[in-house]
Amino acid sequence: MKSRTSNYLKTIYETSYTQRWTCNKQLATMLGVLPGSVTEAVNRLISQKLVVKNKGQIKLTKRGYQLVADLMYRYRLCEIWLADNIQLSLPEVPRQAWLMSAIDSSVVMAKLNQQMAYPKTSPFGGALKLESFSKYQHPTLLSLLSIPVGKEVKIISFLETPATIHYFQHSGLHLGQVLTINSKNTVL
């Protein structure tokens, strides 16, 4: 079973992907917990110097980011193995990969990486090796809401929630696909 710290760090990383910060409400929504639980957990992460909080914005520290980089490497390596080698249904992959990534053996992970010929990205477009902390602090990615109508975008990755995966499969969307922004719905 994954630790509560690991779950929070992964969720902070995922919810702060384009703006490099998140808030209690986003964490509570993504984790399916009450806001009070988030406050308690974030305060614990602050005391461990894994995150900082300023004016409601929760950000990973360098130490927290280093832990996330290791977590995401193991998690995404397991995603690839489950999708490509086991051919598990894509909506099932994230949950099972998260459980498997609790294996904290660098030897096992190195062998798995070697067996799969050193893949670079997960089935959902996430990089196995995260960028350096200094690059992480200065995002170059944009959210879809910030792209003007009429511009083209290329799908390079997406959040691997079951709902998102089902949406991509149902809509025929795939990594590498180029789309034109026709309209925006800020209500979603």
Where are the model-predicted features located?
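Short amphipathic alpha-helical interface segments
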Residues: 6-20, 148-152
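Short acidic, hydrophobic short linear motifs in intrinsically disordered regions
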Residues: 18-28, 155
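Basic amphipathic alpha-helical segments that dock to polyanions
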Residues: 27, 38-48, 176
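Key DNA-contact positions within bacterial/archaeal DNA-binding proteins
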Residues: 36, 91
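A short, conserved structural fragment
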Residues: 46-56
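Basic, amphipathic "hinge/linker" alpha-helix immediately C-terminal to the N-terminal HTH DNA-binding motif
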Residues: 56-75
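Mid-protein regulatory/catalytic core that forms ligand/cofactor-binding pockets
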Residues: 101-188
